[in-house]
Amino acid sequence: MMQPLYLVGPRGCGKTTIGMALAQATGFRFADTDRWLQSHVQMSVADIVEKEGWGGFRARETAALEAVSAPSTVVATGGGIILTDYNRRYMHRVGVVIYLCAPVSTLVNRLEAEPEADLRPTLTGKPLSEEVREVLEQRDALYRETAHYIIDATKAPAQVVSEIIAALPPSTQRLQGDVYT
């Protein structure tokens, strides 16, 4: 059994898209902390935040992280999962953490194109480009501190997956076949 692979990064960096492709390429299971949380509490992230505040959401997010963490699993995390010290230490100790890094312009373009964007609560109440810039400035150091590997997420998903697989230690590269040749 292999350690879980945790994908971290801001909204729009491709954690879910890359995570599903990486799981397929490695034969690992795929889990998404936000989706797990929403399916278990039957509320959107925005509804959880409205009813319980960010503190309540962050506590539930930690529970989701622990629930989906299992060997041979690719875990797409919420963008703010690194805000909790426990989560950073847990992921770094239990698995391999990969920071999907992308510039503000890429993140904004992707978020504007997402149909689910309205389901996410604003973090600052500011226009999207300003919010993304501010949030990334606040969190980038935490993503980097937590990550074992930093991967450029501006490329096509297949290329990002290939780069992740190439970066991983051989013991983690248990593939069912080279999907992206």
Swiss-Prot record:
The LID domain closes over the active site upon ATP binding. Mg(2+) binds at residues 16, 32. Keywords: Amino-acid biosynthesis, Aromatic amino acid biosynthesis, ATP-binding, Cytoplasm, Kinase, Magnesium, Metal-binding, Nucleotide-binding, Transferase. The gene is aroL. Catalyzes the specific phosphorylation of the 3-hydroxyl group of shikimic acid using ATP as a cosubstrate. CDD domains: SK (cd00464). Monomer. Pathway: Metabolic intermediate biosynthesis; chorismate biosynthesis; chorismate from D-erythrose 4-phosphate and phosphoenolpyruvate: step 5/7. NCBIfam families: PRK03731.1 (NF002988). It is found in: Cytoplasm. Its cofactor is Mg(2+). This is Shikimate kinase 2. It holds the Pfam family SKI. One of its GO terms (molecular function) is shikimate kinase activity. SUPFAM superfamilies: P-loop containing nucleoside triphosphate hydrolases. ATP binds at residues 12-17, 120. Substrate binds at residues 34, 58, 79, 139. One of its GO terms (biological process) is chorismate biosynthetic process. Residues 112-126 are annotated as: LID domain. It comes from the Bacteria. Binds 1 Mg(2+) ion per subunit. InterPro entries: P-loop_NTPase, Shikimate/glucono_kinase, Shikimate_kinase/TSH1, Shikimate_kinase_2, Shikimate_kinase_CS. Belongs to the shikimate kinase family. AroL subfamily.
